[in-house]
């Protein structure tokens, strides 16, 4: 899931939260 981490930018807060859920 490293690609998702790179795609998650600081500006993208909403997608970042979803990414955290996916990782969890």
Curated annotation (Swiss-Prot):
Keywords: Leader peptide. Changing residue 24 to L: Elevated levels of aspartokinase 2. It comes from the Bacteria. Involved in the repression of the lysC operon which encodes aspartokinase 2. This is Aspartokinase II operon leader peptide. The lineage of its organism: Bacteria, Bacillati, Bacillota, Bacilli, Bacillales.
